[in-house]
Regions:
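A glycine- and charged-residue-rich anion-binding loop/surface
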Residues: 1-383
């Protein structure tokens, strides 16, 4: 006997009673079947509900041949009437995300004559795929239209059409459908075959915000937040932007220009530092001209700078050159000998200095979790 789906009668039903029809073990969990349930099973891109059933924790819900199975952490007595409580914040979040996705997908598909080819309601965001090259500017335009539609607070319409009625409806669907089809409609925005749970009015979505766009296969993949998720994202973005503004002594709406100016200053300073580094590297190369094998332990610097210093000194010292830059516990290194295979030396060095890295043709680069004393001791014993 198929399970009666109370969530279709009232998606806002948070508590209910049902009779335990069957209870069977599955590993360390139990699969419980009721005569009726308000727990939504995973399907159509929407995750399953969680909650409490007769005191047992419900951690998953899925459907099999019209029967809904509740995965519980303990057994429930067959024949007993049990009380169920939905994890409502989780369910309502899913309803906001799913309804918001319908509204924007209906508008995008109509505007760009495309199909929604993929939908995943994740814990962090909603991922949607479309088989059209929709520009980011167009996505933002639809976002604005969708939010206006949401604020107009349109009612959701649910239909169970006959096969003949269904054939005449301009609805969206990602696959061929058989049996009774459920149609959810936000009039003027979307009509779609859907088995999920939705808000009753568009205003309950709150707002929608696209936060990601990328090329995907023959179209685009969009990342969307709706309702509480969108509000939390915008609130966090405002807090972070305000913090940046305070650091740069500008108003939040001027942070982009201030950061651009700061990056320009940083690039100027980097260029100046690179010039000073180059002069110092040449000085050290001259200082160690003809010195044979040379070890240099330097303050922290970028890996590229370590390599350039090692290269400069190796050209004049007539032997192996090693540069370590950092502090005790963490060094970046470069080793060069233009005329010898340094592979055996590097294997021994990495083993002794807890190093990671390598190279070829007389050059190696990496890092070592050691002290300066250990570096100098190894160098003295192996040079």
């Amino acid at each position: 006997m198929e399970t009666v789906r109370l969530y279709y009668e009232n998606a806002f039903l948070r508590e209910f009673d049902g009779v335990v029809v069957d209870c069977r073990p599955q590993g360390k969990k139990w699969l419980v079947i009721l005569d009726q349930t308000a727990f939504y099973p995973e399907g159509g891109g929407q995750p399953a509900d969680h909650g409490i059933l007769g005191g047992a924790k419900v951690t998953d819900v899925h459907e099999r041949d019209g029967v809904i199975l509740h995965t519980c952490d303990r057994a429930l007595p067959e024949g007993e009437t049990v009380h169920g409580e939905i994890d409502w914040p989780r369910r309502f979040d899913h309803m906001q995300q799913h309804s918001g996705e319908h509204i924007v997908s209906g508008m995008l598909c109509a505007a760009y004559n495309c199909d929604n080819t993929g939908f995943h309601l994740g814990e962090g965001s909603v991922i949607i795929d479309y088989n059209a090259d929709i520009p980011w500017e167009g996505v933002l335009d639809i976002e604005a239209q969708a939010n206006r539609y949401i604020w107009e607070n349109h009612s959701l319409v649910t239909l169970y059409p006959t096969a003949g009625e269904l054939a005449a409806l301009p609805y969206r669907s990602k696959k061929e459908l058989t049996g009774q089809v459920r149609i959810t409609q936000f009039p003027g925005a979307d009509m779609c075959a859907c088995c999920g749970t939705h808000v009753s009015r568009s205003g309950q979505v709150g707002l929608v915000k696209f936060i990601g766009w990328q090329k995907f296969r023959d179209g685009v993949r969009l990342e969307l937040l709706c309702g509480q998720r969108a509000l939390e994202y915008l609130s966090l973005s405002w807090q972070q932007n305000s913090a940046v503004g305070r650091e740069l002594s500008v108003k939040p709406d001027k942070t982009a220009q201030a950061v651009e100016r700061l990056l320009g200053e940083v690039q100027t300073l980097k260029a100046r530092c690179a010039g000073l580094e180059e002069a110092e590297f040449h000085r050290l190369a001259d200082e160690h001209r003809g010195a044979g094998s040379v070890l240099l332990v330097q303050p922290p610097m970028e890996p590229d700078s370590v390599r350039r210093l090692c290269d400069a000194v190796s050209r004049t010292c007539s032997g192996r050159c090693a540069v370590f830059a950092g502090t005790d516990g963490g060094y970046k290194y470069a080793v060069i000998h233009p005329e010898q295979d340094i592979t055996p030396f590097m294997k021994a060095m990495n083993a002794a200095l807890r190093g990671r890295g390598g190279g070829r043709d007389g050059f190696a680069q990496g890092s070592a979790a050691c002290t300066e004393e250990e570096i100098r001791r190894f160098w003295a014993e192996n040079t």
